[in-house]
């Protein structure tokens, strides 16, 4: 399949000159031809230049694509809404740390929890295909969705048009009987929502999964990777072009790329084709296959990026999953404070967020998710001037040390990309477990520790295991099937019934995080070291686990710049009513105010710091909750 962009100008000129030559030679006298031909050439060339003026055609190579600037609208937008809504919204169930939209993959790889849930709720012989007629979307209202997203303060919307199960939310002729027009809602979801979103003044974007788990041409994750070519040529590329040419989204979010290089997906060709079709406002993300270091960056369930030359937006759900997961606990959901703080930190570091909602199968967005969006929108109504269109200040954030403690019954954790607990962050945290271990048998014990990233084990003040290095980070997109680290081993002889001091240290850098500790011996079957053999202190008569201390840095203050003004966003109200800003001496006449409250606040400059006196602010004058923005106006 030829994806090179044809040059129509040269063909047009050749045809025109040939026609003119024939016309002149047959019908126009020689002297008239000499005068007529140059005039026509000038007219033609002028017309061609004018037709091409202002539009650059990009070539299907990374050099050409990298010469294209990223559209300013995306850098300015800061907030987008992601929507995962498909057949997996019918069961809407997975493990507590799993993505609900990966339900089919769980069935395919033998996930007993998902398999047993489906059998119990839907029947012994029920298959994933049987969810299609149950996905009715009878309460779906595109105008209501768009209205909610606009009230949240979002500037763009990103709909999953097709996830890894191949089910399409538009009437794709490449997925007959497997799209929302043929089965389920019997509606063009992509078309209806695109229209409603644009009418509200927001940009419309579309997520598209490059591979599919269950396509007969190539079953991603099941078939051999070299079988993908026919799927790409006969299904993926024509379907991708069908989708994009029909709806012309301002943004494309591709996904599922990580098992193949970008050349397999013909990524450069598709991106160039898209840019030339849609024009300057078009933007793509960074998930196009190996070797394609291109597109706006999309960290997923992380603590964000600290600096990037390219635009970026953190993607995550309000809970642990993108698609609705009814097995999630309330504690898994972001509080309004969590959401505002997460958003502000991303903006201060030069990015933004694409926050996800997962509707029910009937098309209703859960009320808790709606409430969170409206709470964020209410905050933005007061403080939007510090957010939209802002850029980074010389000092993006200020941090403080945070920690929490608890008794952990055992070291058996798969945090995936989540925090082990508030206020500790998702990335760059440490944990230390201390206490006593009491073996059941006198034996030479083999201890095994598996961790992403580093882990060390001491027993009786002896270093038994030392894996103190960071694991290589994977792709941002491969979360659910990211490989586990290799276990480290160590031996030590222990006596039955004796309590030995034990200490385990752990650190996490970025992306996925887990920590496990096993033991085994000639008499002891391999198992996670159980709570019955772990003691937080010597006074414990019964095993209760180990004393755990989790630590990280946490942001307390963020900065942005907009229209020449500096904005200091405090994530906590100072207990002494003195807001301390680490910045240079402001110019004479500088005024500092609290957004949403009339009047200015007194300030002074001492020891290289601006100290703002907040005592004049009465509690009834606070314009918002969760974070407060102070404008430093020149």
What is each of the regions a protein language model found here?
Residues 52-398, 541-634:
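Mature catalytic domains of secreted/periplasmic carbohydrate-active enzymes
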Residues 399-551:
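Acidic/polar, compositionally biased interaction segments
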């Amino acid at each position: 399949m030829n994806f090179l962009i044809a040059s129509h100008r040269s063909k047009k000129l050749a045809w025109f000159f040939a026609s003119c030559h024939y016309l002149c030679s047959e019908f126009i006298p020689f002297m008239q031809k000499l005068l007529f031909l140059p005039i026509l050439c000038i007219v033609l060339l002028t017309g061609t230049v004018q037709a091409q003026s202002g539009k650059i055609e990009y070539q299907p190579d990374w050099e050409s694509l990298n010469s294209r600037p990223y559209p300013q609208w995306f850098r300015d937008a800061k907030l987008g809404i992601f929507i995962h809504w498909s057949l997996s919204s019918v069961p809407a169930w997975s493990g507590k740390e799993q993505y609900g939209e990966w339900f089919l993959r769980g069935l395919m790889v033998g996930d007993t929890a998902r398999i047993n849930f489906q059998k119990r709720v839907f029947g012994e012989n029920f298959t994933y295909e049987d969810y299609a007629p149950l996905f009715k979307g009878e309460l779906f209202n595109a105008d209501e969705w768009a209205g909610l997203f606009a009230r949240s303060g979002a500037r763009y919307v990103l709909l999953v048009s097709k996830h890894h199960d191949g089910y399409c939310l538009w009437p794709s002729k490449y997925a007959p009987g497997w799209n929302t027009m043929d089965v389920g809602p019997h509606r063009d979801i992509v078309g209806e929502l695109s229209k409603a979103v644009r009418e509200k003044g927001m940009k419309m974007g579309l997520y598209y999964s490059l591979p599919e788990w269950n396509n007969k041409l190539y079953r991603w994750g099941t078939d051999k990777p070299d079988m993908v070519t026919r799927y790409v040529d006969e299904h993926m590329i024509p379907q991708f072009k069908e989708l994009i040419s029909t709806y012309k989204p301002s943004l494309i979010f591709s996904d599922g790329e990580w098992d193949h290089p970008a050349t397999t997906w013909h990524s450069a060709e598709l991106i160039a084709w898209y840019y030339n079709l849609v024009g300057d406002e078009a933007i793509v993300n960074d998930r196009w296959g190996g070797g394609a270091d291109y597109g706006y960056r999309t960290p997923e369930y992380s603590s964000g990026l600290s600096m990037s030359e390219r635009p970026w937006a953190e993607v995550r759900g309000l809970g642990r999953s993108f698609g609705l997961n009814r097995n999630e606990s309330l504690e898994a959901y972001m509080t309004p404070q969590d959401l505002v703080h997460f958003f502000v930190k991303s903006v201060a570091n030069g990015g933004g967020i694409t926050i996800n909602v997962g509707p029910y199968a009937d098309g209703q967005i859960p009320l808790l998710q709606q409430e969170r969006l409206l709470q964020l929108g209410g905050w933005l109504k007061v403080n939007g001037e510090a957010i939209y269109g802002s850029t980074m200040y010389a000092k993006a954030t200020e941090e403080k040390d945070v920690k929490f403690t608890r008794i952990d019954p055992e070291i058996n954790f798969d945090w995936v990309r989540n925090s082990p607990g508030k206020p500790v962050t998702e990335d760059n945290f440490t944990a230390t477990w201390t206490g006593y271990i009491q073996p059941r048998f006198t034996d030479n014990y083999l201890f095994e520790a598996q961790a992403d990233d580093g882990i060390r084990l001491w027993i009786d003040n002896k270093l038994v295991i030392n894996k103190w290095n960071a694991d290589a980070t994977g792709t941002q997109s491969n979360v659910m099937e990211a490989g586990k680290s290799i276990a480290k081993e160590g031996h030590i002889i222990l006596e039955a019934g004796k309590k030995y001091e034990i200490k385990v240290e752990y650190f996490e850098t970025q992306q996925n995080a887990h920590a496990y500790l096993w033991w085994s011996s000639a008499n002891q079957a391999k198992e996670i070291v159980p709570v019955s053999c772990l003691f937080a202190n010597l006074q414990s008569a019964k095993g209760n686990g180990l004393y755990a201390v989790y630590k990280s840095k946490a942001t307390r203050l963020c900065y942005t710049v907009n229209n020449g003004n500096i904005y200091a966003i405090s994530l906590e109200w100072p207990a002494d009513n003195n807001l301390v800003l680490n910045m240079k001496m402001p110019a004479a006449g500088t005024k500092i105010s609290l957004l949403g409250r009339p009047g200015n606040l007194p300030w002074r400059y001492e020891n290289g710091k601006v100290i703002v006196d907040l005592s004049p602010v009465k509690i009834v004058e606070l314009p918002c909750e969760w974070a407060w923005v102070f404008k430093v106006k020149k």
